[in-house]
């Protein structure tokens, strides 16, 4: 079993440490996987498309620009991720249906909750490098999450 603290000790010069504070909403507190990215503004169509197409074990990183206008993820989309065996979802934005999310057996991190739903226009970008939390989130890098933090590595550190 790995811990982010141990990975930081062992691979200190090879990691990025996310400086953003997230809240955990999913059933899993610890998760890791290869990163896939989505950048959107108050629109979760590309989030849904990503969840429906990404391979098992992936972590979808959603940059919603920390917008407080709406939630980008709720129980329906999280259930798709669970059904498809994704490792987790990290949202630089907000979620809703939090009482249901805690029963979804994946990792889910977000800034907080917002009851308002997103628009459905399909605007945004997928598979691009993102910048938030003081780190660069690049597709196909690896992210490791537990109760102590979020770290990113260009290579797999744990199998």
Curated annotation (Swiss-Prot):
Its EC number is 4.1.3.17, 4.1.1.112. It comes from the Bacteria. Substrate binds at residues 74-77, 96. It catalyses: 4-hydroxy-4-methyl-2-oxoglutarate = 2 pyruvate; oxaloacetate + H(+) = pyruvate + CO2. Keywords: Lyase, Metal-binding. It holds the Pfam family RraA-like. Its cofactor is a divalent metal cation. Divalent metal cation. It is an enzyme of class 4 (lyase). One of its GO terms (molecular function) is metal ion binding. A divalent metal cation binds at residue 97. One of its GO terms (biological process) is regulation of RNA metabolic process. PANTHER family: 4-HYDROXY-4-METHYL-2-OXOGLUTARATE ALDOLASE 3-RELATED (PTHR33254:SF4). Homotrimer. Catalyzes the aldol cleavage of 4-hydroxy-4-methyl-2-oxoglutarate (HMG) into 2 molecules of pyruvate. Also contains a secondary oxaloacetate (OAA) decarboxylase activity due to the common pyruvate enolate transition state formed following C-C bond cleavage in the retro-aldol and decarboxylation reactions. Belongs to the class II aldolase/RraA-like family. This is Putative 4-hydroxy-4-methyl-2-oxoglutarate aldolase.
